[in-house]
């Protein structure tokens, strides 16, 4: 991630203005935040992960797949899940006959063992249902509604950086700021107990094709 000239640091509102003004692609660029945390990501107890609902959404449709059986399938369909299926769907995925083009996968606790058979397919894509994200639940309708309203997941990488989408360049600065604050709040709540002192080292915002913009420290 390259910085703008002289590594200039902006206040968050000016930073968003710079990112939006610099977006010149012939498509609607996403706006992302990258947060460098003061953590040792090699330690399992210092990995930061979680999920948060963006109050202003993502600016695009969030797609959901549901693995379940019986009445739970009907509930998922009524809740407008994009892909719904049972063991047959799992077999299609194993045979690569189903393109799972979704953002989230959900299942019910009693069907989790079946979904585990495709963990090697879902896991690398970050799609494996996880109780921590409320994607293993009997309350599928509620979970689908929350996710489609703009829920995202976040996870620190090997360098201790959290990347998250917070909208696109057509969003107002006020809407981007609300989403940004929601992500920051969720990351603060996920702060490992072992981390002392400064938590946020550097914060950058960037559009899909633009240069990153460094914004002021969040530790003040």
Swiss-Prot record:
GO terms for molecular function: rRNA binding; structural constituent of ribosome; tRNA binding. GO terms for cellular component: large ribosomal subunit. Coiled coil: none annotated. Belongs to the universal ribosomal protein uL1 family. HAMAP family: Ribosomal_uL1_B. Part of the 50S ribosomal subunit. This is Large ribosomal subunit protein uL1. It comes from Ehrlichia ruminantium (strain Gardel). The gene is rplA.
């Amino acid at each position: 991630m390259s910085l703008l000239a002289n590594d200039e640091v902006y206040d968050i509102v000016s930073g968003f203005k710079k990112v939006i003004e610099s977006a010149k692609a012939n498509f609607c660029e996403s706006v992302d935040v990258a947060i460098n945390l003061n953590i040792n990501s090699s330690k399992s107890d210092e990995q930061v992960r979680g999920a948060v609902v963006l109050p202003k959404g993502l600016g695009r449709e969030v797609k959901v797949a549901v693995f379940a059986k019986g009445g739970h399938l009907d509930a998922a369909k009524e809740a407008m899940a994009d892909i719904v299926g049972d063991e047959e769907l799992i077999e299609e995925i194993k045979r690569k006959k189903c393109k799972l083009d979704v953002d989230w996968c959900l299942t019910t606790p009693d069907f989790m063992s079946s979904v585990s058979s495709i963990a090697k397919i879902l896991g690398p894509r970050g799609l494996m249902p996880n109780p921590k994200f409320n994607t293993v639940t009997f309350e599928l309708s509620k979970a689908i509604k929350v996710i489609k309203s703009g829920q995202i997941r976040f996870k620190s990488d090997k360098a201790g950086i959290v990347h998250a989408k917070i909208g696109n360049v057509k969003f107002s600065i006020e809407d981007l700021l609300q989403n940004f604050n929601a992500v920051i709040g969720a990351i603060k709540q996920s702060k490992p107990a072992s981390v002392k002192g400064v938590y946020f080292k550097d914060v950058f915002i960037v559009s899909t094709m633009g240069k990153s913009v460094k914004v002021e420290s969040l530790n003040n």
